[in-house]
Structures are given as structure tokens and as C-alpha cells.
């Protein structure tokens, strides 16, 4: 008989890994909870000793074989319409209140041309509809949401650039600025926001930071609540350490105010060790 291994209890002062929930995986949970509404393809394929899919749902601390209270879910994978019941979204929407969900915004979908619209045009209706949907969805399902940032490399892909209307580095910056201002006003009262930093090299990363840092400052009555490290900021150790020093000296990594720093797209084991060491040093 398999014995529960509580991974939440084993987490102490390590950098927290966020398992990214895929819509396919979540569908299996929903199919088991609502068999009359969702077709399951699991059948008899569960390994011996695993009674059901709920045993594989780490957000269910009662039934999971390996409870783990932290997760990441992306707007790019989700059904964001919270006005309707969607069984395959129940793993996320129906999670226990003692879990923690970080919601990615879908900026990657914009950068790949999957969410078309004239994102450089602040009056574009398609972009505004998606903008509103993302912040409402984040406010409804997450503890932390990320800003709807547009990566600076977006314009380098001609097809994606044409689909999303981002033609230059400055277009990406200006569109993200507008998105940030909108999120600042439209977010739900309980949603915390991570200010995502982008940039394909040190020069772009520094410029982006200087432009966006105000959203985490006391310039606003309710500033953003932490940082998302994207682009070069998530993979360049020199830049990461330099940025941390700058944040500390500028009062933008304050306990109780900027308590979360997320590194986008980072899951290699060596980075788990490195980020744990950095986290302990900062603390």
C-alpha cells in the first residue's frame, strides 16, 4: 500500500518550485469528479496501487499521495470564463483555500501570435477584451498574478509581430506599460501582482527595469507585490545578482511588500540549488 508523502511539510527554506498545471492533466481530475460531463481517457491505465486520479492531485492534501500546496497555471491554457462551470478547470477553481496559486498572464501567447490584436494600440478592442478577461480570471482563481508583459523579442518573429502588432522593442515596452496601468486599477482586492521584468540583453533589461520599477514603489497607493523575472533576467546569473542588489538599495525588495520573486520558465535542477542559495543569502 502506498503511503502519503507530504511534500508541503518537507519544504522549509528552499526555493519553491511551482508545478505548471497543464489543461490536459487538469481534465483528468475534472473527468473523475464529473464523469457525466467530461469524457475520461484514463480507463484502466492507472498503475496498481493508485486508486484514482485524485491521488495524483497534489493540491488535494487529504487524498493526494504527494500533497504540495504550490502551483502555477497559465491564462494561455485556461478557460477564463468564470461565469460558467467548467469541470476540467475544477482542479484549479476548486482547490483548497490553504493552497497557493500563481497565475501567469499569457504574455507568451501574445509574443507567439496566439492572442492576436493590435497590442500597441491602446484602443484596440480585441486586445482590451483579452486584457479584461485575464485580470478577472487571475483575480478569481489566484493568490498571485503576473502582469500582462510583452517580451521584447516579440517583434523579431515576423509572423507573431504581424499578428500582435508589436513592431519594435519600444512597442513591447509601451504596450506593457499600458497593461500594467490597467492591471493596477482593475485587479481584485485580494490579488497580488508580480511586476514582470523583460529584456533580451543587459541594456534592454536595465531600460525595462527603470521604466517598470515605479509599479512596485510608493508612487501608487497599492503598488505591485513582487517580481517576475523573464527574458535575460531569468537565466543570466550576473544580471540576476546585479538586479537583486539594485532592488535592495532602491527599497523595492521589502519584507511584507515584495515577498515573492518568480523566475519564469525555470525548472532545471541546478537552478533549484542556485536560487535556494540566493534566497537564503537575501534573507
Tell me the role of every PLM-derived stretch.
Residues 1-180:
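Non-catalytic, usually N-terminal nucleic-acid engagement modules in DNA/RNA processing proteins
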Residues 129-134, 168-183, 208-212, 240-248, ...:
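A general structural detector for well-ordered alpha-helical segments in enzyme core domains, enriched
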Amino acid at each position: 500500500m502506498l503511503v502519503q508523502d507530504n511534500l508541503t511539510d518537507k519544504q522549509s527554506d528552499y526555493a519553491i518550485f511551482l508545478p505548471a498545471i497543464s489543461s490536459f492533466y487538469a481534465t483528468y481530475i475534472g473527468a473523475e469528479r464529473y464523469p457525466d460531463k467530461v469524457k475520461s481517457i484514463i480507463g484502466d491505465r492507472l498503475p496498481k496501487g493508485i486508486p484514482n486520479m485524485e491521488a495524483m492531485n497534489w493540491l488535494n492534501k487529504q487524498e493526494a499521495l504527494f500533497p504540495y500546496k504550490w502551483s502555477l497555471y497559465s491564462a494561455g491554457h485556461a478557460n477564463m470564463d468564470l461565469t460558467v462551470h467548467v469541470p476540467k478547470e475544477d482542479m484549479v477553481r476548486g482547490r483548497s483555500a490553504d493552497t497557493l496559486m500563481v497565475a501567469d498572464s499569457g504574455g507568451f501567447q501574445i509574443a507567439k501570435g496566439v492572442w492576436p490584436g493590435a497590442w500597441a494600440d491602446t484602443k484596440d478592442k480585441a486586445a482590451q477584451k483579452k486584457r479584461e478577461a485575464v485580470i478577472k480570471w487571475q483575480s478569481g482563481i489566484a493568490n498571485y498574478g503576473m502582469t500582462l508583459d510583452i517580451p521584447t523579442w516579440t517583434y523579431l518573429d515576423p509572423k507573431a509581430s504581424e499578428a500582435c502588432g508589436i513592431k519594435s522593442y519600444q512597442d513591447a515596452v509601451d504596450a506593457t506599460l499600458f497593461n500594467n496601468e490597467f492591471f493596477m486599477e482593475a485587479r481584485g482586492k485580494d490579488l497580488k501582482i508580480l511586476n514582470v521584468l523583460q529584456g533580451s540583453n543587459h541594456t534592454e533589461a536595465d531600460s525595462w527595469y527603470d521604466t517598470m520599477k515605479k509599479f512596485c514603489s510608493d508612487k501608487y497607493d497599492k503598488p505591485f507585490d513582487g517580481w517576475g523575472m523573464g527574458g535575460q533576467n531569468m537565466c543570466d546569473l550576473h544580471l540576476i545578482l546585479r538586479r537583486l542588489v539594485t532592488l535592495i538599495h532602491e527599497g523595492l525588495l521589502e519584507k511584507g511588500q515584495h515577498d515573492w520573486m518568480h523566475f519564469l520558465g525555470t525548472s532545471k535542477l541546478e537552478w533549484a540549488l542556485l536560487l535556494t542559495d540566493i534566497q537564503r543569502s537575501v534573507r
